[in-house]
Design a protein with these regions (language model features):
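Mid-to-C-terminal alpha-helical segments outside catalytic/metal-binding sites
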Residues: 2-7, 14-51, 59, 239-240, ...
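A generic "structured core" feature
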Residues: 3-16, 133, 142-143, 147, ...
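Conserved, mostly hydrophobic/aromatic
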Residues: 8, 60, 90, 117, ...
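Divalent metal-dependent hydrolysis catalytic cores, especially in the metallo-beta-lactamase
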Residues: 27-41, 47-68, 87-95, 115-122, ...
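Acidic-and-aromatic substrate-binding clefts and catalytic sites of carbohydrate-active enzymes
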Residues: 39, 66-72, 94-102, 162-168, ...
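A general structural detector for well-ordered alpha-helical segments in enzyme core domains, enriched
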Residues: 47-51, 73-80, 101-108, 143-150, ...
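Active-site gating/metal-coordination segments in enzymes
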Residues: 72-164, 217-221, 228
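Catalytic pocket-lining loop regions of alpha/beta-barrel enzymes
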Residues: 134-251
């Protein structure tokens, strides 16, 4: 049984926290996840372990899930993690332009499982439903970048979720803060899956891979390639990532329970295994477990 440290999981409970997009259909969320009407309103550790039972999960990276009160949600997740035998590292939500950023980081610092923060930076110039940032230019905004100074003081890593056309702005940021670890989510989120889109995505990722303080997460396959994705379709993209970042900076994640709207945990991880079957056992262990476990280790 393969040992796994899942690099991207959402655990939540609509009775404990408010997730508006789960109470009423949200067109923006639907634009990336498709029809999510069957997504559960409660998904806890035991639900995840049932879904992943065919694999030996040693730990997970819990990601905030668009709650109305991110601090309340983080405290709830901390309690959930403490009550479980499963190691749980946490990535929480911030706004780097928030005047109260320092206060929020102080609060997060009291939660031992919090190892990273993220802000939703995605801005699709061609689709107004996929504009999750305040503005399209945050990565180049000097005031926004100053928020990273506060992050550095607290020792948190920084999650980066954006769309592939924004990738070219990222290396300037990661080079400016070489002592902050940056995690690029959703494979750099390619929007254009055509041959020319692939070429541009690979070019921009290759530049970013030269920054040793960046790791990349391979997850949310269903959001990129659709609910009916095929292994043959996703393999070149995944293998390109590993070629550029190497096994020690590449990590697999499930994106459960959203992945459950597609093929589910077992078939997803089976596909991952088939795609990287030619790598050595040590290299596979890095991608499935060791990279995420080390990158998201407790502060």
């Amino acid at each position: 049984m393969l040992s796994v440290f899942d690099a991207h999981v959402h655990l939540f409970d609509c009775e404990a926290n408010t997730h508006a997009f789960l109470e009423h259909e949200d067109r923006s969320f639907k634009s990336i996840a498709g029809d999510y009407s069957t997504l559960p309103r409660r998904y806890l550790t035991e639900d995840y372990l049932n879904d992943s039972a065919s694999y030996q999960v040693e730990g997970i990276v819990w990601y905030e899930f668009l709650s109305a009160d991110p601090i309340r949600e983080a405290r709830w997740a901390q309690h959930l993690g403490v009550a479980s035998h499963l190691r749980q590292s946490m990535v929480v939500l911030v706004d780097f332009l928030d005047p109260a950023l320092e206060e929020r980081l102080e609060t997060y610092s009291t939660l031992p499982n919090v190892v990273a923060v993220r802000e939703h930076l995605g801005w699709d110039t061609g689709n107004a439903l996929r504009r999750f940032a305040k503005r399209p230019d945050l990565l180049t905004d000097q005031a926004w970048r100053k928020g990273l100074d506060a992050l550095r003081r607290h020792g948190f890593k920084c999650g980066i979720e954006l769309f592939a056309p924004q990738l070219s702005d990222l290396p300037d940021v990661t080079r400016l803060y070489p002592d902050i670890g940056f995690t690029l989510a959703v494979m750099g989120w390619p929007l254009d899956l055509s041959p020319s889109g692939y070429t541009q995505w690979r070019h921009d990722l290759k530049v970013l891979s030269g920054c040793e303080n960046v790791c990349i997460e391979i997850a949310a396959i269903e959001c990129l390639f659709g609910m009916g994705w095929r292994r043959e379709e996703i393999a070149p993209w995944i293998l390109s990532i590993i070629d550029m970042f190497g096994p020690t900076r590449s990590m697999f994640g499930s994106h459960m329970p959203i992945a459950g709207l597609s093929v589910g945990f077992e078939r997803l991880y089976d596909a991952y295994q088939e795609i990287v079957a030619k790598f050595s056992a040590i290299e596979r262990d890095h991608m499935f477990r060791d990279t995420a476990a080390a990158w998201f280790k407790p502060r």
